[in-house]
Amino acid sequence: MPEVVINGPEGRLEGRYHHSKQENAPVALLLHPHPQHGGTMNNKVVYTLYHAFVRRGFSALRFNFRGVGRSQGIFDRGEGELSDAASALDWLQTYNPNATACWVAGFSFGAWIGMQLLMRRPEIDSFIAVAPPANMFDFGFLAPCPASGLVILGDQDQLVTADAVQRLVTKLMNQRDIRISHRIIPGADHFFQNHLEPLSQAVEQYIAGNQRKRAAVAGR
């Protein structure tokens, strides 16, 4: 799990990268929760997502947004963090020019940034949004949502409301050719304390199902 340095809009961005041994492996970018509330690339949920992708054969990158850890810059209320994510995706694609698929996955604030990146980068094939804070941030930019994905929430989440997430999922599911899987993890709070294993299982099941569908289409 080598440390990497990415040239970001405001200076260096600190990251951790796993390069798959598989030729032309798919890639995944992982985005951490709110920088001003202790969010880092080493967050347990982000770490869990990262290793779920690694186990499914992906080349995966997680990094610290500006002002977090050894990443340069200061918090920019989402706008700068979106630019950071775009730079990280550029880096990931530079080292994986023949990747068979491109995913973005984020937790909480990171899910909000990831969905915005999804709108700007048509090469992103799918997404995973864990506890997307639909009751705190505006997700109205998803009009229309350009890719299918997975939304996960714990039923004991104390920060993100189930009603707000359900409205977001319903909005996305009403769009043509977009398929949204919505998973509820029983007993899990916002940080999935003592529930990281069922989170990992849900993510890996979704990724595996997506990979099977892609393989079936390619084999026709």
Where are these regions (language model features)?
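Serine-hydrolase catalytic machinery in alpha/beta-hydrolase-like enzymes
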Residues: 6-96
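Catalytic histidine neighborhood in serine/cysteine hydrolases
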Residues: 172-191
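Primarily recognizes the serine-hydrolase "nucleophile elbow" in alpha/beta-hydrolase
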Residues: 85-147
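Acidic catalytic loop of the alpha/beta-hydrolase fold
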Residues: 155-160, 190-191
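Catalytic histidine-centered segment of alpha/beta-hydrolase-like enzymes
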Residues: 73, 188-200
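Catalytic active-site module of serine/aspartate enzymes centered on a nucleophile-bearing elbow/loop
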Residues: 196-220
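Short beta-strand/loop motif that positions the catalytic acidic residue
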Residues: 145, 151-153, 157
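Short alpha-helix in the alpha/beta-hydrolase fold that links the catalytic acid
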Residues: 161-171
